[in-house]
């Protein structure tokens, strides 16, 4: 340890003004904290013998200013999604429509009718804001919203199957991420999982053979994040609903992603709709709000009134209920389906509906802008993905602007783009950076081009 070096470390007060001059938008508190952390780190380096010398004051101020800027940069902030993955789980899944975002902001900023009945002047139900819409759109007798689909399944099984058995196909024992698995959730709900059939083949007769005195329900789980192909067979929801009802049991279906729109129109196959499950006879259907539905994070339950009334009275519901902003955004999203504007106004559906011709034209436009800045870019046909644990094994025909960096490696370019104030997240393939058009908005092009130009150095 060099005591002379310790004495040469500047005092906090000496660095405050010059540091603040480098980051004038930072608060005084952030600058002071950053200067202290910078000097503390330097002191530790001297004590450990790692610092060969004391840096110049200007260098210390630059380090502190950078730390102050980082400290005041919001952790949760907008991202430019150039991955072509529409429901990117790590980037927040579904983007809200302008109408839904405004509804959420209004609910946050103002007092609201969250649990207030304007007719009677008494207490109302927060579920009432979306229940009628959900019933109208799905044909269900009743509806309920909780904070995500995992919560919806948890509430459903806890309230209606605790202490009994639930019959599920072995081929549908899914994990949806974060170690949230059907067998574990059954155990947590106090129910016993009764597996039937095999991984690739399960028939209605397998369910029938498993029904006994302890059976509380038959359940079908849509394998939204994987597919079993080849020599396969599964019981239809219609078969299972009829079987369950013939034995005096309820039939549940967990759709996972869930949809209110027939995605076959976009060339996306195998995704059932909520209304289809209701028509098939399901007593309760669950799905997510922030995936194919295109709304906020929520768990949606629709089905028979007799089932959902039990859920509405269960004490667990209070722990799983949604807030006013979620309800406002969900109501606005559902109204888009009700008035027929969903495909044109909900970003998720609009992105899924984008044709290859539209995307190719957009890719040409972006490449022209990139070329004008001296960036090497060309239009490249590339497959996009739905994402969000939805529609596995299907790619959407898309186009990208493929950038070949001139002054750095492609991985360095990608890293620099990620670290910008507004991060740009893209893909790397064929030794080029791919900017996929399906998930980009035209109003983002100029900022994206500037980001690439400034990062390719």
Report the location of each language-model feature:
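Conserved PLP-enzyme active-site core in the AAT-like
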Residues: 120-337, 370-371, 451
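Structural motif of enzymes handling amino- and sulfur-group chemistry
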Residues: 306, 314-315, 322-370, 382-383, ...
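Long amphipathic N-terminal alpha/beta scaffold segment
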Residues: 51-96, 100-103
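Long amphipathic alpha-helical segments
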Residues: 1-68
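A short linear hydrophobic-aromatic micro-motif
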Residues: 75-76, 143, 287, 422-427
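Conserved C-terminal alpha-helix-loop-beta "cap" of PLP-dependent enzymes
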Residues: 356, 360-441
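Glycine-rich phosphate-binding segment of PLP-dependent enzymes
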Residues: 35, 40, 82-83, 93-119
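Short Gly/Ser/Thr- and Asp/Glu-enriched loop/turn motifs at secondary-structure junctions
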Residues: 9-10, 80-84, 293-296, 396, ...
């Amino acid at each position: 340890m060099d005591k002379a070096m310790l004495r040469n470390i500047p005092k906090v007060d000496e660095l405050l003004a010059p540091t603040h001059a480098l980051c004038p938008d930072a608060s005084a508190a952030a600058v002071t904290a950053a200067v202290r952390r910078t000097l503390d780190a330097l002191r530790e380096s001297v004590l450990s013998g790692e610092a060969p010398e004391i840096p110049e004051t200007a260098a210390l101020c630059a380090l502190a200013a950078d730390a102050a800027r980082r400290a005041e940069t919001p952790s949760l902030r907008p991202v430019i999604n150039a991955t072509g993955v529409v429901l990117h789980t790590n980037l927040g899944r579904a983007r809200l429509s302008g109408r839904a975002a405004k509804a959420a902001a209004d609910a946050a900023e103002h007092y609201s009718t969250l649990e207030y009945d304007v007719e009677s002047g008494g207490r109302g139900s927060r579920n009432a804001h979306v229940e009628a819409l959900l019933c109208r759109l799905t044909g269900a007798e009743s509806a309920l919203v909780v904070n995500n689909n995992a919560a919806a399944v948890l509430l459903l099984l806890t309230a209606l199957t605790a202490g009994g058995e639930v019959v599920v196909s072995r081929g549908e024992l899914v994990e949806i991420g974060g170690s949230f698995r059907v067998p574990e959730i059954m155990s947590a709900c106090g129910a016993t999982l009764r597996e039937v059939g095999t991984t690739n083949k399960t028939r209605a007769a397998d369910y029938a053979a498993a029904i006994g005195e302890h059976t509380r329900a038959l359940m079908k789980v849509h394998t939204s994040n994987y597919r079993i192909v080849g020599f396969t067979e599964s019981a239809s929801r219609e078969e299972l609903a009829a079987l369950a009802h013939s034995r005096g049991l309820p039939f549940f279906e967990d759709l996972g992603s869930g949809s209110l729109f027939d995605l076959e129109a976009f060339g996306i196959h195998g995704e059932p709709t909520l209304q289809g499950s209701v028509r098939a006879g399901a007593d309760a259907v669950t799905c997510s709000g922030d995936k194919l539905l295109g709304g906020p994070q929520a768990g949606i339950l629709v089905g028979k009134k007799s089932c959902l009334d039990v859920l509405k009275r269960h004490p667990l519901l209070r722990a799983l209920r949604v807030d006013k902003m979620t309800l406002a955004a969900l109501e606005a999203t559902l109204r888009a389906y009700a008035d027929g504007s969903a495909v044109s106004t909900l970003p998720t559906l609009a992105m899924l509906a984008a044709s290859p011709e539209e995307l190719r034209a957009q890719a040409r436009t972006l490449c022209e802008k990139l070329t004008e800045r001296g960036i090497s870019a060309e239009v490249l046909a590339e497959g996009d993905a739905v994402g969000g644990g939805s529609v596995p094994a299907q790619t959407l025909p898309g186009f990208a602007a493929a950038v070949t960096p001139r002054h750095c490696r492609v991985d360095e370019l990608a890293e620099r783009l990620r670290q910008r104030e507004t991060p740009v997240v893209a893909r790397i393939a064929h030794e080029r950076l791919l900017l996929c058009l399906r998930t980009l908005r035209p109003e983002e092009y100029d900022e994206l081009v500037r980001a690439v130009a400034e990062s390719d150095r």
